[in-house]
Each structure stands twice: as structure tokens, then as C-alpha cells.
Regions:
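Low-complexity, Gly/Ser/Thr/Pro-rich intrinsically disordered linker/tail segments
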Residues: 293-304
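...with weaker cross-activation on analogous glycine-rich loops/strands in unrelated enzymes
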Residues: 223-284, 290
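Mixed-charge, Lys/Arg-rich low-complexity intrinsically disordered regions
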Residues: 37-46, 233-241
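Boundary regions of SH3-family modules and the immediately adjacent low-complexity/disordered segments
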Residues: 1-33, 48-54, 58, 62-67, ...
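Active-site nucleophilic cysteine motif
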Residues: 190, 201-221, 226
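Loop/turn positions that initiate beta-strands
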Residues: 63, 135-146, 246-248
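Residue-level "contact hotspot" at macromolecular interaction interfaces
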Residues: 59, 137, 240-243
Length: 304
């Protein structure tokens, strides 16, 4: 099977970066473009300014589905990330460009089953229990299909674009929940991402942005939220200011401008307003009381 415009494909690397255009990539981006991506090396190789360059739109995790809309002979595919709603950009999902080496054609006969989800911050898929690493850098929130039951602390799983089962430490995966999670459960997962570096467009425990943190925390529980903060606000329910609880969302906008930031509420009502967020200024995920200038731009409280 080959990639074809108008057909679905799946991500075959641990984390695939979605680019604004193929021409937007920089020399520093080579580790994120390699057929076997090395996102930690990419993050480590960028300076502070490069980490917030708008050439990156989003990121997709191993197994995520895309709709291929164009193929270029130089190894690039224009795609729509159908698991990342983006109503403001495309009703089908988040549009952008991926290297074709990061994709495999969707297989209608691919194994099915009750999914597992990666609960570890970072793990890897191996050729055999304790064997060579085949897919490094697999991150929290990645969904996998079990191939069989556990063996000596390892779990065989099917991975998109890779023949045969691969192996993951059994402790690194859990069954993907099917019900609505408690807000405190989601907040606890998000809190495990404290101090992860801020990467514009990041959606992984290697590097993340504000709306990526929200998207990923709920993805861990099988809940699909939009990718960008303004769409997240539209997709969630309003809560009166002063009645927010941990796990709700704060949204921020300057007068007359669209929403530009989101954070996860961490404090009960009646005290200081606090949130966990991927902070552009501090360049990392942190929990803090809302500074005065941030509080002045608080425009909405919403609940998933």
C-alpha cells in the first residue's frame, strides 16, 4: 500500500511534528525530520527563541490518523490531523505538513481491540522483551492495540507502520478509559508534566505549549479536545467566575482580541486563583497564582 491523496494514513514515529510549510523548516529541525525522529535532541538543540518559532503548528503521536490531501515528490505530505479538531482552520481537523517518512497508509485490516494508552511520561517500543529499541521516545497519551497478554512484565502491542508486535514495559500502559474522567484525575496527569519545556506547537512530554497541555491531559483519558485554545473554549461549558474548581480551564484574551492562552485551574474557589499551564514567559510548565497582568486578561472559565 502507498500513501495517496484523499486517503487516510497513520503516524509511524513516536512524535511527528506538523509544519506550517516544508520551506519553514530550519537546520536545527533535522532531528525532528529524520525517519526515526529524535525529539529530545531537537528540543535540546534549540535556543529559547527557536523553541517558540511559529513554523511548528502541532505534533501528532504514534498511531494518530491523518487525511492526506497532497503529496509532493520531495517527501512531504499535506495532511489534516483528524484527531485534533480545529474548527477555525478546517472542519476536518488541524491542517499542516508532515514528512512522508513519518506516515504509513492506513490499513483497513489492521488489528483491532480495546486500546491501551501510555501512562509513562516517556517510554519505548522494543523488538522483544528487553530487546533492541524500535520506536524510541513514545510519550504519554499514545494509544496502542494489545497483541496479546503480558509476558514477564512486558506487553506485546501493535504499532502503526511496523510489522509484527512490538514490546512495551507492562507498567507503562493502562487500558484506555471509556467514561468521562474526574477533573482531579486529569489535573493529576497534567501535573506530571511540570517543568516540561515550552515548545510552540508541542503536544508531548518532550515539549509542550498551553493548549497542547490541555489537549494531551484529556487525550490520556480518551477525551478528544480541540488543539487550539480558542477552539477549546468553544468546545467546553461555561462556569461562572468564582465557581471554578480544580480541573476547570481558565482562558485569557486581550481586549478585542481572540483567546491566546489557557491554563488548568488548581485551586478551590474562595482563595487565590491558581493554575497549571505551559508558560510562554517562563518557557516551561508550572503551577502559580495568576499574576496581576494575567488576571486582567482572564475572560472565561470553562469545564470539560
Amino acid at each position: 500500500m502507498k500513501l495517496q491523496p484523499g486517503r487516510e494514513a497513520v503516524v509511524r514515529v513516536a512524535v511527528a511534528t506538523l509544519w506550517a510549510t516544508p520551506e519553514a523548516v530550519r537546520p536545527v529541525d533535522r532531528p525532528a525530520l529524520a525517519p526515526r525522529t529524535d525529539i529530545p535532541a531537537w528540543v535540546a538543540g534549540m535556543d529559547t527563541d527557536q523553541r517558540v518559532g511559529e513554523c511548528v503548528l502541532s505534533q501528532l503521536l504514534l498511531g494518530e490518523r491523518v487525511l492526506v490531501t497532497e503529496l509532493r515528490p520531495d517527501g512531504w505530505a499535506r495532511v489534516v490531523a483528524v484527531e485534533q479538531p480545529a474548527a477555525e482552520l478546517d472542519p476536518r481537523g488541524y491542517p499542516g505538513w508532515l514528512p512522508t517518512a513519518h506516515l504509513a497508509p492506513a490499513d483497513p485490516a489492521a488489528p483491532a481491540g480495546e486500546p491501551l494508552v501510555v501512562d509513562a511520561g516517556v517510554t519505548a517500543l522494543h523488538a522483544a522483551p528487553n530487546g533492541p529499541v524500535v520506536v524510541p521516545g513514545v510519550v504519554l497519551g499514545t494509544r496502542l492495540i494489545p497483541a496479546d497478554g503480558p509476558v514477564d512484565g512486558w506487553r506485546p502491542v501493535h504499532a502503526s507502520g511496523h510489522p509484527g508486535p512490538l514490546w512495551i514495559p507492562e507498567a507503562d500502559v493502562v487500558p484506555l478509559p471509556t467514561g468521562q474522567p474526574e477533573p482531579g484525575e486529569v489535573l493529576a496527569v497534567a501535573e506530571r508534566l511540570r517543568d516540561v519545556v515550552y515548545i510552540w506547537g508541542g503536544v508531548s512530554s518532550h515539549g509542550i505549549d498551553c493548549s497542547g497541555l490541555v489537549h494531551l491531559a484529556w487525550r490520556r483519558f480518551g477525551v478528544t479536545l480541540p488543539r487550539d485554545a480558542d477552539d477549546q473554549a468553544e468546545a467546553t461549558a461555561p462556569v461562572p467566575l468564582g465557581e471554578e474548581h480544580p480541573g476547570d480551564l481558565y482562558f485569557f484574551a486581550r481586549p478585542g482580541r481572540p483567546i491566546h492562552h489557557v491554563g488548568i485551574v488548581t485551586a478551590e474557589p474562595g482563595g487565590d486563583r491558581r493554575m497549571l499551564h505551559a508558560c510562554y514567559r517562563q518557557r516551561r510548565v508550572l503551577e502559580e497564582q495568576l499574576p496581576a497582568d494575567r488576571a486582567a486578561t482572564l475572560v472565561a472559565v470553562r469545564r470539560v
